[in-house]
Amino acid sequence: MKKAWLSRAQQADAGGASGSEDPPDYGDQGNVTQVGSEPISPEIGPFELSAASEDDPQSGPVEENLDAAAREEEEPHEQEHNGGDDPLDVHTRQPRFVDVNPTQAPVIQLVHAVYDSMLQSDLRPLGSLFLEQNLNIEEFIWMCMTVRHRCQAIRKKPLPIVKQRRWKLLSSCRSWRMGYRTHNLKVNSFESGGDNVHPVLVTATLGCDEGTRHATTYSAGIVQIPRISDQNQKIETAFLMARRARSLSAERYTLFFDLVSSGNTLYAIWIGLGTKNRVSFIEFVGWLCKKDHTHIREWFRQCTGRPKAAKPWLRAHPVAIPYDDPLTNEEIDLAYARGQAMNIEAPRLPDDPIIVEDDDESEEIEAESDEEEDKSGMESLKNIPQTLPYNPTVYGRPAVFDRKSDAKSTKKCRAIVTDFSVIKAIEEEHRKKKAARTEQPRATPESQAPTVVLQRPPTQQEPGPVGPLSVQARLEPWQPLPGPQVTAVLLHEESMQGVQVHGSMLDLLEKDDEVMEQRVMATLLPPVPQQPRAGRRGPCVFTGDLGIESDEPASTEPVHDQLLPAPGPDPLEIQPLTSPTTSQLSSSAPSCAQTPWPVVQPSQTPDDPTKQSRPPETAAPRQWPMPLRPIPMRPLRMQPIPFNHPVGPTPHQTPQVEITPYKPTWAQIGHIPYQPTPTGPATMLLRQWAPATMQTPPRAPTPMSPPEVPPVPRQRPRGAPTPTPPPQVPPVPRQRPRGAPTPTPPPQVLPTPMQLALRAPAGQQGPTKQILRQLLTGGVKKGRPSLKLQAALERQAAAGWQPSPGSGTSDKIVQAPIFYPPVLQPIQVMGQGGSPTAMAASAVTQAPTEYTRERRGVGPMPPTDIPPSKRAKIEAYTEPEMPHGGASHSPVVILENVGQGQQQTLECGGTAKQERDMLGLGDIAVSSPSSSETSNDE
């Protein structure tokens, strides 16, 4: 082609005519100017062709033997550039410039312009660049446009435009549709493995098609690249570092990267792993917990919503998910230490191979053989992120609660071992210990463990108040225990097959083997649900002093119900609960819901009266046929009045009382407070009286007649008091009225307090124990009488109970929460003439019952309608004429207990001081008739 252009130029210089030759037929190439008819002057340039040369018919033809490759390149563009403006019109408008539009001008014009540039010496390097063999059409056009733009920029300076950065490549031609501009942007780059930010200046050269016209040119507007925020840049950097760490890590850790990326917590991954992956997961967690992992910690927080990685194996494993072959603490510690010693870049042990993947080599290997293609396919499957079958919800902690890193303490609990040689030495030592443990034979456990009985001497207790007291008085010193305390400790529960029953039950009972009896009864009785027990003192019952024997040995069952510690300097001494014996079951057979009997415990030994000790805390015995009501948590602590108290006031025996109301069990079941004693020949249990806050049950069951079996008199030790149930004939009274030096016993037999209560006015009955309690506490309540209690007292009077002979001489104070009703002496009433006369049994007559006004004539008052408590009020009733004498006026103290639904009456003569002396209250303040406040009924 170069030779053809040179020959054409020589012909033009020679001026030879070529009219005989046919002009070249360009066919569908459009209007193409005939370039080369005249020589190109250096002043015009390669792209500035004259219009006269285009119209000259004498111009030489273009060589037809063009390069075949050039023609192949021209053919696809022929159809595109046929339409549009005629290039000749453009040349006429701009005679000194040929506009070569890439979207309209055919490519052959550019080819001619390039070859024309070869004729100029200064443009030959540009022509040689265009004639490069490796250029395609797009690159060829781009180079032409660059040369054109540069030539125009040299001739004409760019127009000044507002917000113009440096210079723009503009065109003054309206047909030019492309604009260029540069834009500078400062961005921050990150440093791998740290938080340091480096500013980088980025210069972008932008171009747009069909840009907004500015002045006489088309150009693009200013494009502002949005700058990423610091938080987003931190997050993107963290994810980039996590992906890099996953690519560099060992293959066994990539699973954990994928699971954490999908939002799973470490605990969810831990409980779902198999046995073979647990050690690797512990190493991965150890690598996550490295302190210098800034980006990895941020990646973990963004994925899971947790502030930092924790040890999931410290939490309890769920029961529903099996946990086979658990790891020991030594294995977990060693695996965690290996993870802590790993490199910060990726979780990799020193022995793990480094896999380098080359994309080009892998493509060549895939093309060589099909087998290697299958292997590469498996490798590509391994690279797919692994996820759990479910998609867990990520709950993130609000940013308000995120603490700064500088506010956290940097204390290290232990040193982190970073040397793998030390870790390997520790692993070897652990492996030797594990092998030694497996070689040792296991010790065979014994078939049955014995029951060990621990005996300890009684503890010493200094005398003094134990808890908060409501009545300030001096305490009686504690009495010593009868002997060493025996506590049964059951090491292992014996199996049911170990208990062998020899013979029948009758033979077992005839042999009187108490130990075997306890075992058999324990196997036959159903298990008892444990009832919550409060820390109150159980009732103390007398055995040694009163001559009462108990056939209940110490039970061997473990103590399940433990009492709460009472207020005091020493802890409670807990004794095991006792199971019911055969005698108790036989005695409680007629009634399936009886009041539980207290356990008998001695309170003093006559051999060593000076030994001071504290009585043990006893729990109420279990009652199998009857459900127990839970006792309130607040304990009931008091020292009751001794049974046979002397008449004179004794300051050392003033009781300490702190009464907390609670609901008794018999009030829930519906039984009267008095129950007959069991008739066993070797068992005599004291009955348990009702507390002060008894509520009348809505219905009374069928009353039971007590068995008419007189109790067997026992020989009591010397100096022990006599237990006296409510008698009918009290002993000879020893009471001294005011002003009388010597007490004068009445000649006739006086009635008992129970008979007085039976003959009292209706609605004013009640045991004297309630009167004594009201005197101690001071609060008196009002309510309806209890028909059930009246029937019980009538049965008691009909049964004819007799007290035990004799009376105690020594005084005792027993730690118990329940009062035993004392025997009240007959009260001497001052007559009208001033002489003391004994009040006979028939002196007390009926008086009208006084109810509350709003409940008068309505019926029995339910416990829920009980009005608030009232104070004691004293009223005087005129008694009618009695059989043994005239009418006498005596003040009647009406004690009304609303909480119990009873109105109790204590007829007394003389002053309140005599009453306290008679009851043994000492100096306890009781409201006198003159100072008592009369309470309103409403």
Curated annotation (Swiss-Prot):
Pro residues composition bias: residue spans: 698-750
InterPro entries: EBNA-3/4/6
Superkingdom of this protein's organism: Viruses
Short name of any one Pfam family annotated for the protein: EBV-NA3
Keyword terms of this UniProt record: Host nucleus, Host-virus interaction, Transcription, Transcription regulation
Single Gene Ontology BP annotation: viral process
Biased composition (Basic and acidic residues): 78-92, 430-440
Residue ranges, compositional bias (Low complexity): 575-594, 927-938
Coiled coil ranges: none
Region of interest (Disordered), ranges: 1-92, 360-389, 430-470, 528-628, 694-752, 849-870, 910-938
Record's keyword annotation contains Transcription: yes
GO CC entries: host cell nucleus
Cell compartment(s), UniProt: Host nucleus
Biased composition (Polar residues): 601-615
Composition bias type Acidic residues, residue spans: 360-374
Family: Belongs to the herpesviridae EBNA-4 family.
Its biological purpose: May be involved in transcriptional regulation of both viral and cellular genes by interacting with the host DNA-binding protein RBPJ.
Subunit annotation: Interacts (via N-terminus) with host RBPJ.
UniProt protein name: Epstein-Barr nuclear antigen 4
Organism: Epstein-Barr virus (strain B95-8) (HHV-4)
Lineage: Viruses, Duplodnaviria, Heunggongvirae, Peploviricota, Herviviricetes
Encoding gene per record: EBNA4
